[in-house]
């Protein structure tokens, strides 16, 4: 045994995305809630629970500097769509929820039926093609622009006019409509070009 070896690794994410805490004496936190001071940027300093197998037990929503994510049995959520508590969310490639108007892949038909590409979207999304001379980023066979609130909840009930950072857009069931054309908005009519504006 070499007494000069330092084991104070602190919080460590393992290959399976679960986390452990390695103390200075090479022991692991287990069976209790402990104040973690050396979190290595994975979590803020604070009190966290560990099970008998030394695994950090995060369950539920968690917000840190990188964003908001969801943990289940100590494992951070991966990328993609999910239904949590009856609300739909999209998690980016780092496992954090998206907010605002964001282009993401379509959800699976099992999760959200009716939210796939339509023939017109896929046909017009060719840069430089007639109908797309300005190379707008139209929906395609893989993804489209969806609306999420500040908590990351997909706004599937939202329909009508939507202010996208000063640009007026037309939304139908939480999804940007690129080819809305003439639409009735209350007592007025609005015309939306193929670019969704």
Question: In which residue ranges do the predicted regions lie?
Answer:
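Extracellular adhesion/carbohydrate-binding repeat motifs centered on closely spaced tryptophans
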Residues: 1-197
């Amino acid at each position: 045994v070499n007494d000069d070896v330092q084991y104070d690794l602190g919080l460590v994410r393992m290959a399976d995305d679960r986390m452990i805490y390695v103390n200075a004496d090479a022991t692991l936190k287990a069976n209790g809630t402990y104040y973690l001071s050396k979190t290595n940027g994975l979590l803020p300093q604070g009190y966290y629970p560990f099970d008998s197998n030394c695994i950090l037990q995060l369950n539920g929503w968690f917000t840190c500097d990188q964003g908001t994510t969801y943990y289940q049995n100590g494992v951070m959520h991966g990328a993609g769509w999910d239904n949590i508590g009856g609300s739909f969310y999209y998690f980016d490639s780092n496992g954090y929820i998206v907010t605002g108007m964001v282009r993401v892949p379509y959800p699976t038909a099992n999760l959200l039926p009716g939210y796939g590409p339509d023939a017109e979207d896929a046909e017009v999304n060719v840069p430089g093609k007639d109908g797309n001379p300005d190379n707008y980023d139209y929906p395609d066979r893989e993804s489209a622009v969806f609306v999420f609130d500040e908590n990351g909840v997909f706004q599937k009930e939202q329909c009508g006019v939507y202010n996208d950072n000063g640009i007026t857009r037309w939304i139908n069931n939480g999804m940007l409509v690129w080819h809305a054309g003439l639409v009735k908005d209350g007592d007025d009519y609005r015309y939306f070009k193929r670019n969704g504006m």
